[in-house]
Structures are given as C-alpha cells and as structure tokens.
Amino acid sequence: LMPFVPNANDLAQWLAADRGRSISLGTSAWQPNERIVGLFDIHKGEKRGDWKLSFETLTTTQRTIHLKGIHNVDGNRPLQNLTYSSAKGLATQAVAMAKVFSKRGTSIAVAQTIPDAWSIARKVAAELEPFVQVHEDIKLVQRFLAAEISEDFELIDMLSKGVVVHHAGLPAEALSLIEWLTEAGHIRVMCATTTIAQGLNFPVSSVFLATRKLPYGNEMSHRAFWNLAGRAGRIGHDSVGVIGIAAGAQPNEIRKYVSDATASLVSRLEGMLDDLQAAGELANLSWVMQQEQWADFRSYIAHLWNEKRNLDAVIGEAEQLLRNTYGFGSLRAKADKASQEKADALLEATKGYVRKLAEHPENASLADVTGFSPEGVRSTLLDMNNLENKLTLADWEPSSLFGDKSKSVLPSLMGIMLRVPQLQESLKEISKGQGNSHRKLADITQAWVTGSSIESIAKTYFEGDSLTDQISKACRAVYRDLANNGAWGLSALSKMPTSGLDFEAMTDEEKRRLNNLPAMLYHGVKTEEGVLMRMNSVPRSIAERAGEDFKARTEAGAENTLSPRKASEYLKSLKPDDWARLKPDNSSLSGEDYLKVWKRLSGEA
C-alpha cells in the first residue's frame, strides 16, 4: 500500500517471509488527486527590467492531458515590485507562481531554508492588498501570536493579507492554528520549507518548489516529492492540483527527476555496506561499526542482547536475528557473491560486537532504557561520576535544577549531554555563539521553564538580522531541539546509576516530581499542575495560572490527586469569565479568546 515503491514484494517478504504477498493496485486508475506536474522558468521581457514566467507540463492525468505543453503564466512581471534581476532567485520564482495560482485557492511556495521562506513571504505580502474585512478567525490567531510570541512578530501583519509561513521556526501550536486557517480557506499563499511534506492534510490548489534539495543539500526522495505533490488538488478539495519545480540552470535534471516517478525502498544498512565494499573497507567492519553512522545499528544489537542476556544464545541466533532487519534479509535473498560477502561480514562483525557487550552487560541494559548507544551510556556514566560534587536528590528537585543559577547542576548536566552522540548535534546548534556552550544551554532552559517569553529568550540568547530572525532561531531551538533532545537527555541522565537518585527509596510524590522534569522542559512550565495544563493544550502564557487554580480546586475536593483526566474535566468546566480571571494582565487575548484557542488546539471545537 506504499505508493511509488516498486519493490513491494521485497517488503512483503521481509515483513512476513512465510506468507508475505504484495497487492497490486495497478489495474485501477485510482490516484489521490487530479494533478499536473511540471517545471517553471523565468524569461527576460522586452522592456528593461521586465520578466515573465512559463510552465512546462511534464506529467498529466487522463483528465488533464489536454494541458500538455508550455504555457505562459500571468503576463508581465507577476510580482510587480521586482525587476528581472531581482526575480531570478528560484525561491522568488516559486512564490511568484504561488501568487498567480492563489486565485484558485491556497498555494504553497516551498523554499529550502527558514530565512528563504521568510524572504519570499515578505515579497509576496508586499504585492497583495490586505483583506477588505479581516476574518475573525484570522484576528484570533493574530492575537494569539501577539500573546504567545511577540506583539511585533512579522507574521501578524502578513496574516491580514492572507500570507503565512510554515516551518520549524514556529511553535507547534502556531503551526496548528495556521493549518486551521488554511483548511478554512482564509490563506492565499503559504511560504514553507520542505517539512511541509510530512503528513499534512490541508486543502491547497498548487505547490511550487524552488528546489528539490533539502536544507543540507540532500535530494528530496521521490516518495517525499510525491507525498508533497499529493497535497494539491486532493479528492474532495480541489479539482486539479498544479505542482511545479523551478527549472533553474539544469532543467533536464528536473525532467528526469519527475519521470523517475518511483524508487525502490533501499535499506540504509545495505547502503552503508555498499559504501564500505566500494572503499575496500568491508574487512574492517568491526572497527568501522564504532563510527557514529552505525550508532542506530549498535543500539539495535544492544536491544537484542538485552532481551536474551545470554552470549551463546545471541551468537547462535545472530543470523536469524539479523534476518529481521530489511537490509540483512535483502542481502541474503540475493544470489550474487558481493551480497553474500556483505552479509557474512555483517554477521561476523555483529558477533564480535555482542562479545564486547557481554563484557559490560549493564551498558546494554541502560542503552535499552535510555535510547543512547552503549558507548554513549559508558561515557555518560563516567562523566557523571567525574563531576566535582556528587549528585543528590536535592540537586534534581525542580526548584533547584531550574532555580538559582549559581547553585544549579543544570550546566553540568548540559555539558554531559553535549558529549552524548545521540544528543550533541541539535544541542550544539542551540549553543552556537559567544560564551560557554553548556552554560548558555542551561540559561535558555531555565528561562524557558520559569516562564520567560519567546521574545525575551530570542532577544537575550539569539543573534539575528531582525527580530523575526531571532524569534525563528529561538522557536526552532526551544520547540524542536531543546524540548525533544533536552527532555530526552534529562530523562536518560536521571536513570543512570551515577545520578545520585535511588528511586526505590523515594516516596511516590518524589518519584512523580522527578518523572515530571522532562515534561517541564518539554512544555516550558515549572510545576506539575502546569504540565497537566500544557498536556491538555492550554497556551503556555496562561498554563501556570490555570494550573494553580486547578490545584486549589482539586485540593479542596474529596479526592485531591492531580491527574490528566481531572485536568481535562476542569478545563471543560471553565467559562469565558474564568479564563478572563486567569489570563495575564498584559495579554492581547481575552478570556473568550483563550477559550476558543484552547478548544481549537485540544480538538474540543
């Protein structure tokens, strides 16, 4: 059932070797949408500074076959403010196409990076008039952005023209509300990054890509491209979707990319072995396996070891255990000598690694619990053991960890996380810039958990050419990197034998407080009741106050334990006046606004 994967039979055999069968839908004319896929290009006009766009159709469906060929798009200068020289950028051409096609419904322009997405959003917003009457839904989202991010946030004014951005530099709640506005038909042009391809389902009429390259230069897979193409003209949304890629300097490459509509699903494991064989390094696999790109495989073997905990059993069953991976199974299924050599090398290297794990089985057990590789576990244990002062339960209390900076152990813990391979890449991205990296990480974490606004964090800790740039960096750092990897790291470190924590000797209340630490970091609040509010989709700006009120009401009742179910019941009971009583004094959202936003975010609307 995976579209655009021709080797379905291989997958079926891997998933169920004894009874796997692929099912072909090839006799059916079914498609997720009626669409035209092509490439667009810029052409110099007759007068100085003039330019125009063309669209060349590359693939059509039965109902759109009459649209084959090359078509002019919207006459001279689709973006009137730009001359030919300033419109030559591929992202600018993409947003010019999106502006033209926005007359048919929401159109998406896809840029390579977050700054590019903002840049083209500014260009198209400068060309559009504000709505004669801005819809109340848009005004609500504008007030939300002012309250939760900044009153000076650039997106607020863009919304008045039906222009939005969609990327990792926005909070998840803001993205959710932007998607809601799109579904409701209030958005003309969306300027996004390629993350837009990840499972979104809002109706758009067209999608235009500046490039098929992802932010770090890798080519977008065919599956990702066709998934993105599937956003346009979905059945029940719009009749015909238009998808275009900028021709750029190598239009023939685009033509080939689109014509190669499918690509076999290839195991990452098999790909790494191919590279080793090509480099003549297959015999050194046991040594190469210690490198970072093999961390996921090492963690998988550690998991297998942890399940058996018997050296002879794991080595004896290694072949069968490896067959459970798609890569090894694919190699064994091939008759050629090269494939068998790769499979044999992997089997022997795996057995060698299992013997190594057996020397320190506790590392494999902790790898299974924490998600770190066994080597990451070992270095973390040593780092925590080498701290100047041994950790105690008091150090892990939220009031201590996120409190007085001079006494908190958080900088030390962040320093340890920065040396864990699974965490370090994204955390180092946050801590770039002047000063001590682990101190900066700890300061941002403390500011986030103790209630500092995104605007304040952006201005204090992130450099940029504009407030928008600073806010984008802060949102990406906090909502994507810190909330995920920081929370993961904090949870993992608390489970280490050298953490100074003895969960067996703790009271239930102490355990609960400690187990809530990662959630506090994830949600940006400092109390258990605040976490419960955020888990139930309460905006961060009001979560702590609502949590205090919830706790007071619960403790006054007969059964005074806090729980997600009780939090949900409490929130459903609140009236607009209650939200108004709890809201921050300086918030641009009214009590009625908070209620509407909460209902929308929680799915209660």
Model-found features: residue ranges?
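C-terminal or mid-to-C-terminal helical accessory/interaction module adjacent to the motor/catalytic core
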Residues: 241, 249-312
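C-terminal accessory/interaction regions of large nucleic acid-associated machines
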Residues: 289-307, 313, 338-605
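Conserved interdomain linker/interface between the two RecA-like ATPase lobes of SF2 helicase motors
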Residues: 4-121, 164
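Conserved C-terminal RecA-like helicase domain
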Residues: 85-189, 216-226
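Beta-edge loop/turn motif
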Residues: 1, 111-115, 175-212, 230
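Short glycine-/polar-rich loops that comprise or flank the Walker A/P-loop
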Residues: 19-23, 33-34, 105, 160-161, ...
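Conserved segment of the helicase C-terminal RecA-like domain
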Residues: 202, 206, 212-262
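Conserved nucleotide-binding/hydrolysis micro-motifs of P-loop NTPases
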Residues: 3-8, 30-34, 113-117, 170-171, ...
